[in-house]
């Protein structure tokens, strides 16, 4: 796609032009070494300089016997001269070991390729690139092998709810997220039968009730959701707000008023938006969080707000969003009533908010709040509330979590097993960061723009550096470990969660990604980046409104990420070999034990695509414990903010009951633990929201523990 250049009509640079023609050359390398094609004139294919590529190609063809595929992309380029440069490339290989085998094989391999060209009549008269050397960046390539443990079964289990997008042409819509940023998904026990149900925010929200085996029926008709007017509901959050033991529902909207619905039981809801104090809550709202901000026993509400791209763009720093909102639950006339205390609480940030997650990050008994903002800096809001007086202070700049970028998802977990909460922020990683170093990268036609070009390029490279993993050092200090841990490249990332998929007692990390698919099959992310230099001049017309969503795609059909926890502070990406292989443009991600075996299933929502449900086959064997909590007084019956520590074989695992995380989504309130092969958990310690504690000993593997605060626990067997 061509878009107008700043100040003129000249076509902007293409990938081939930015790469000085090397993009075509590395494609030829891929075809020769990994597809078995022999191209004329590529040069040096049989020489010693190509030996590392040739050796990998031979190994790959020996490992992959069926449906083998390969892809390559340039992720960095260093130019020495017009005829001498180095490119760093990633080869992504995947396929099946044999036609008659479920075993999959995959490899992601990085090479630094030194390239040159000469324009002499005697040697390479066409001036084509030649390979001087190929150096594997991380040593010899490892070819992964594995039989999948995740199986996509949404349709066969009755979970069918096509996404209902708005008009695909952004220029006709009111704000950017209403068209391309949703939907999310909520996993919550709606009808109180102990089985996790599914709510899908949508133009017409949907409810799917679980029959207890992980199969679902569409129960939308007659639920009260069917009485709601058409909306842009993209996300939501569910928790027991009124203390009756049933999960109430909040739906966030971008244009229409947000909705709050009381759970009447038996899968029925009633709209209480006005009655409970939230009438007229309209704006470009995204993710929401229920939590008890001031420890008064009532569930409060935080809603992140985006911005309206038609009015003004984020102006590089993204400090002109709609303004996040905080509502304190004061209880009135015997039912919840929400009062806007945004200003007094300190939670009225004006970034372009997309995601939020509450967590007691400093283990002081109250939940802090992290907010991920698009186009700028994120916020870490330390909770300094007193009883009845919510108050937060943004300490992101001083505690190491500001993470300037394009924040799109929030996940809390303890990935290194040290008993402290770590933080993952989904962000934007692009393989095209290197074009921002190029003098041809377009800038707006402003006086003195040449002076700020180095600053602009540096800022944009910093913002597009990928996901942020922050290790908790204690004392509310964090260190970014994304690159060292191997999780920076999440693609154009959205939903994310820490979850122990394989039951080994370590939290893995799931990240979903993708923007939108083209009707032509053309991915035109380069044009997006060509336009981003004008972000602060006119974002809607100059950047987003200049993209024809009906024709050209962007960062679409990208592999999702399953970062398997090695147990040494690093992760191995294993999505394809484990079966987490959808190429849909995914948004929301949530997990829950849907079939009662203790293992987490994963549900994804997709932009212009179907729901996905991944059944977990690692659950077979019973080596898990599930903890289900209920407070015995006050309105916070779901025990939001309760923290559970499970100790087994000298190691500690950490979980917290939350409502709202990932991106526009919510995972189950049940807390899932893997015992790593142990026969029992040695100790389970529960710290309730009011500070009281309970301790359980010798809890066998394969147990569902239901614990009401202050009472003896009930133990049931998980399904095997």
Annotate each predicted stretch with a short phrase.
Residues 1, 16-33, 37, 52, ...:
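Short, aromatic-enriched amphipathic alpha-helices that serve as compact interaction elements
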Residues 7-23, 62-154:
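Short beta-strand edge/turn micro-motifs at domain boundaries
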Residues 87, 401-434, 457-520, 584-622:
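Repeat-solenoid scaffold signature
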Residues 139-180, 209-231, 261-283, 315-351, ...:
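Blade-edge motifs of beta-propeller repeat domains
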Residues 182-190, 209, 233-243, 262, ...:
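Beta-propeller blade termini
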Residues 195-202, 249-253, 301-305, 368-373, ...:
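Hydrophobic beta-strand segments that make up the repeating blades of beta-propeller
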Residues 201-211:
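Beta-propeller domains
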Residues 552-561, 565-566, 570-720:
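Gly/Ser/Thr/Pro-enriched helix-cap/hinge segments flanking short amphipathic alpha-helices
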């Amino acid at each position: 796609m061509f878009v107008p250049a700043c100040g003129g009509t000249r076509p902007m640079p293409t990938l081939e032009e930015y790469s000085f023609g090397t993009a075509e050359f590395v494609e030829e390398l891929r075809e020769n070494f990994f597809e078995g094609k022999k191209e004329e004139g590529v040069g040096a294919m049989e020489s010693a300089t190509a030996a590392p590529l040739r050796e990998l190609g031979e190994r790959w063809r020996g490992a992959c016997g069926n449906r083998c595929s390969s892809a390559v992309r340039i992720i960095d380029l260093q130019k020495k001269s017009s005829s001498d440069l180095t490119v760093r490339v990633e080869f992504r290989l995947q396929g099946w070991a044999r036609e008659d085998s479920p075993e999959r094989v995959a490899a992601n391999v990085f090479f630094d390729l030194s390239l040159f060209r000469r324009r002499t009549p005697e040697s390479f008269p066409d001036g084509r690139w030649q390979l001087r050397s190929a150096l594997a960046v991380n040593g010899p390539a490892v070819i992964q092998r594995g039989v999948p443990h995740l199986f996509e079964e949404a349709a066969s289990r009755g979970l069918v709810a096509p996404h209902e997008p708005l008009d695909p042409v952004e220029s006709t819509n009111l704000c950017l997220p209403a068209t391309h940023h949703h939907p999310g998904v909520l996993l919550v026990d709606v009808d109180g039968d102990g089985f996790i149900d599914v709510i899908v925010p949508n133009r017409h929200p949907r409810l799917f009730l679980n029959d207890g085996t992980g199969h679902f029926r569409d129960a939308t008709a007659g639920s009260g959701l069917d009485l709601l007017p058409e909306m842009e509901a993209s996300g939501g959050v569910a928790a027991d707000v009124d203390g009756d033991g049933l999960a109430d529902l909040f739906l966030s909207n971008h244009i229409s008023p947000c909705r709050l619905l009381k759970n009447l039981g038996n899968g029925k809801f009633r709209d209480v938006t006005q009655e409970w104090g939230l009438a007229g809550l309209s704006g470009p709202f995204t993710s929401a969080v229920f939590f008890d901000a001031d420890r008064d026993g009532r569930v409060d509400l935080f809603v992140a707000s985006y911005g309206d791209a038609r009015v003004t763009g984020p102006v590089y720093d993204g400090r002109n969003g709609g303004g996040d909102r905080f509502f304190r639950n004061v209880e009135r006339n015997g039912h919840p009533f929400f009062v806007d205390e945004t200003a007094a609480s300190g939670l009225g940030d004006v970034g372009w908010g997309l995601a939020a997650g509450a967590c007691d990050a400093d283990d002081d008994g109250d939940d802090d709040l992290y907010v991920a903002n698009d186009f700028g800096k994120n916020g870490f809001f330390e909770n300094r509330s007193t009883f009845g007086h919510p108050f937060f202070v943004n300490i992101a700049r001083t505690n190491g979590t500001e993470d300037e970028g394009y924040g799109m998802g929030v996940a809390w977990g303890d990935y290194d097993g040290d008993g402290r909460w770590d933080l993952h922020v989904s962000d934007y990683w692009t393989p095209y960061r290197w074009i921002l170093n190029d003098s041809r990268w377009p800038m707006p036609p402003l006086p003195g723009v040449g002076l700020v070009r180095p600053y602009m390029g540096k800022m944009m490279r910093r913002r597009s550096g990928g996901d942020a993993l922050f290790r908790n050092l204690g004392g509310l200090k964090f260190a970014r470990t994304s690159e060292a841990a191997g999780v920076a490249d999440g693609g154009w990332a959205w939903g994310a969660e820490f979850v122990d998929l394989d039951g080994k007692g370590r939290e893995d990390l799931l990240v979903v990604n993708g923007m939108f698919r083209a009707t032509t099959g053309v991915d035109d992310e380069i044009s997006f980046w060509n336009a981003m230099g004008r972000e602060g001049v006119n974002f809607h017309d100059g950047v987003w409104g200049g993209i024809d969503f009906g024709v050209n795609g962007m960062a679409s059909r990208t592999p999702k990420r399953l970062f398997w926890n090695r147990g040494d502070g690093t992760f191995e990406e294993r999505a394809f070999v484990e079966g987490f292989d959808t190429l849909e443009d995914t948004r929301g991600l949530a997990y829950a034990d849907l079939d009662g075996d203790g293992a987490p299933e994963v549900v994804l929502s997709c932009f212009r695509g179907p729901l996905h449900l991944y059944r977990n086959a690692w659950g077979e064997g019973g080596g898990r414990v599930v903890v289900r909590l209920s407070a015995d007084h006050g309105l916070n019956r779901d025990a939001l903010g309760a923290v559970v520590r499970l100790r087994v074989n000298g190691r500690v695992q950490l979980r917290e009951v939350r409502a709202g995380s990932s991106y526009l989504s919510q995972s189950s309130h049940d807390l899932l633990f893997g015992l790593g092969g142990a026969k029992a958990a040695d100790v389970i310690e529960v710290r309730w929201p009011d500070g009281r504690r309970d301790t359980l000993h010798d809890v066998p593997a394969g147990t569902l523990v239901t614990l009401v605060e202050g009472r003896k626990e009930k133990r049931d067997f998980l399904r095997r």
